[in-house]
Structure formats: C-alpha cells, structure tokens
Amino acid sequence: MTTKLLFVCLGNICRSPAAEGVFLHLIEQRQLTDQFLVDSAGTGGWHVGNPADRRMQAAARRRGI
C-alpha cells in the first residue's frame, strides 16, 4: 500500500517544498520510494508556478538534498 503525504505551507515556495525534498531524500536513502507518494502545496495562490525560494534551494544543496 502506498502512503500519501502532503506538506503544506502558505506559499509553497519555501517550507513545504523543503520538507518534501528532505523527506524524499530520506526515503531514497532507505530505498522506500515505492511506498510513498509525496507532494507539497500552499494555502495561497501567490506563487503558483514559481520555483522554490533560491535561498532554500541553496541550503538544500549544501546539505546534499
């Protein structure tokens, strides 16, 4: 059975995409990707279509995520 997991924040450009990325990284390390369906979303539509915040992307890269 696949577990569905949704990370939610206000704009979906910083916190929830970061949480999604960290979780995906962890399940990949443990070879569990086939057991989870992971996504992120925002409660507001201000940033629809925008990539994750560049500072968050840089922080994730520094941590190997």
Swiss-Prot record:
Q: Which Pfam families match?
A: LMWPc (PF01451)
Catalytic positions? C9 (nucleophile), R15
The UniProt GO MF terms for this protein read: protein tyrosine phosphatase activity
Question: Is Transmembrane one of the keywords?
Answer: no
Q: Does the keyword Transmembrane helix apply?
A: no
| Coiled coil region boundaries | none
Stored SUPFAM superfamilies: Phosphotyrosine protein phosphatases I (SSF52788)
For this UniProt record, the keywords arranged alphabetically read as follows: Hydrolase
- Tell me which domain of life the UniProt entry assigns to the organism this sequence originates from: Bacteria
Fetch the PANTHER family from UniProt: ACID PHOSPHATASE, LOW MOLECULAR WEIGHT PHOSPHOTYROSINE PROTEIN PHOSPHATASE-RELATED
Homology family: Belongs to the low molecular weight phosphotyrosine protein phosphatase family.
What is the recorded name of this protein?
Uncharacterized protein in rpcF 3'region
Query: Which organism does this record belong to?
Result: Synechococcus sp. (strain WH8020)
